[in-house]
Swiss-Prot record:
Residues 187-223, 323-428 are annotated as: Disordered. The gene is ssb-a. Phosphorylated. SMART domains: LA, RRM. GO terms for cellular component: cytoplasmic stress granule; cytosol; nucleus; ribonucleoprotein complex. La protein plays a role in the transcription of RNA polymerase III. It is most probably a transcription termination factor. Binds to the 3' termini of virtually all nascent polymerase III transcripts. Residues 7-99 form the HTH La-type RNA-binding domain. Keywords: Nucleus, Phosphoprotein, RNA-binding. A motif (Nuclear localization signal) lies at residues 196-212, 316-332. Residues 227-349 form the xRRM domain. This is Lupus La protein homolog A. It is found in: Nucleus.
Length: 428
């Protein structure tokens, strides 16, 4: 009994080792793995086992060369070859990588399935264990946030379209006590498109409501301001001197009422004065001081108190004109006080001539996960950085003068010591 258990455990271990190495050299990982692609170019595709055991997930399974070789010999895929010296492996030249054209990408979509409902604390091994009796799977993508936190959902790629269709026939699945959401990739994108349309419609309605409320608040504020100023307008008209100015009006009322604004242009025959106080009081005081004969620059003037709707319209126009004038003046003041650099050149001008570093630009991978737009650094770049960090394990010392390597404890779970890789690429 114990002997049979040991054999089963050994068989399971060999299967995991073989699957892991075949994943590294497989159709989904190899095109994205810059480090491994570089190694392949060095020796006609051969990669030393000494290099392979520095890959994180494989090193957790075994670092023994003989164990690796024995596991690979049991493989039925014929994907990998072992060299005569039994110290290197490579992808078989008889099984070249597929061409990454539209036809191939479409075939992947038809074999892809979206599954949601895993706890965010789940790891790749948990997911693989749950999937092990659900059909032959080529690739598992653990979907993550920009902060590398698991979202609780995955994309899996089956070996064939039929395998994916068979899996989709039974969608009443559970992970422990969690009900799972299962969709084909086409259904997933259709669902996301509908959600985006709905969100866009909701945002549009929300924006419209916000604008409507803002407009109402502005109108209420304006109405309140107008109501507060009722009784403060005084209209004047007549055969005015062409040289009459606003300064003349200020001089006329300076001891009788504070003037806030005058709507008048030199040469005009009428205008309106906005007082900070009641216009009738100011007019009565000015008339009393001038024997009830209030002239403007020696000319007879008709003075009128504006009332009712006419007053409200005039107040609205004057207050708008006052605000517009204030905004223009503020803009001129802002330009006026811009600093000058040496040589009399403005600092803003000189700064435009200098090229400034604006930080690392980020691109977004929108090929399949348009809804998530996960931040994307080249997966090849992430992989080579990861393998560089793995260079000190198993006695392999860093090259003289090379930068200090990170500890292998920083390695991620989905490849050879991945350094905070930005995009999830076939976690296996």
């Amino acid at each position: 009994m114990a002997e049979n258990g040991d054999k089963e455990q050994k068989l399971d271990s060999d299967t995991k080792i073989c699957e892991q190495i075949e994943y590294y050299f497989g159709d989904h990982n190899l095109p994205r793995d810059k480090f491994l692609k570089q190694q392949i170019l060095l020796d006609d595709g051969w990669v030393p086992l000494e290099t392979m055991i520095k890959f994180n997930r494989l090193s957790k399974l075994t670092t023994d060369f003989n164990t690796i070789l024995q596991a690979l010999k049991k493989s039925k895929t014929e994907l990998l070859e072992i060299n005569e010296e039994k110290c290197k492996i490579r992808r078989s030249p008889a099984k070249p990588l597929p061409e990454l054209n539209d036809e191939y990408k479409n075939s992947l979509k038809h074999k892809s399935v979206y599954i949601k409902g895993f706890p965010t604390s789940a790891i790749l091994d948990d997911v693989k264990e749950w999937l092990k009796d659900k059909g032959p799977i080529e690739n598992i993508q653990m979907r993550r946030t920009l902060q590398r936190e698991f979202k609780g959902s995955i994309f899996i790629i089956f070996n064939t379209d039929d395998d994916a269709k068979k899996f989709l026939e039974n969608r009443n699945l559970k992970y422990k006590d969690n009900d799972m959401t299962v969709l084909s990739r086409e259904e997933y994108h259709a669902k996301k498109n509908e959600e985006r349309k709905l969100n866009k419609s909701e945002e549009k309605a929300k924006s419209k409501q916000v604008k409507k409320e803002a407009q109402k608040q502005a109108e209420d504020a304006e109405r309140k301001l107008v109501e507060e100023r009722v009784g403060s307008l005084l209209k004047f008209s007549g055969d005015l001197d062409n040289m009459t100015s606003r300064e003349d009006l200020h001089a006329l009322f300076q001891t009788h009422g504070d003037i806030e604004w005058i709507d008048f242009s030199r040469g005009a025959k009428e205008g309106i004065v906005l007082f900070k106080m009641n216009a009738k009081e100011a007019l009565d005081k000015a008339k009393a001081a001038n024997s009830d004969n209030l002239k403007l620059k020696g000319k007879d003037v008709k003075w009128e108190l504006i009332e009712g709707d006419t007053e409200k319209e005039a107040l609205k126009k004057i207050l708008e004109g006052k605000q517009e004038s204030f905004n223009k003046r503020k803009g001129r003041d802002g330009r006026k006080f811009k600093g000058k650099g040496r040589g009399g050149k403005g600092n803003d001008s000189s700064s435009r001539k200098r090229t400034q570093f604006q930080g690392k630009k980020k691109t977004f991978d929108s090929s399949d996960d348009e809804d998530d737009m996960e931040e994307s650094e080249s997966p090849q770049k992430a992989s080579v950085k990861a393998e560089e960090s793995a260079g000190t394990k198993n006695g392999a010392a860093a090259a003289p003068g090379s930068p200090k390597k990170r500890s292998l404890d920083d390695k991620a779970e989905d490849g050879p010591a991945v350094k905070q890789s930005k995009t999830e690429v076939g976690d296996q």
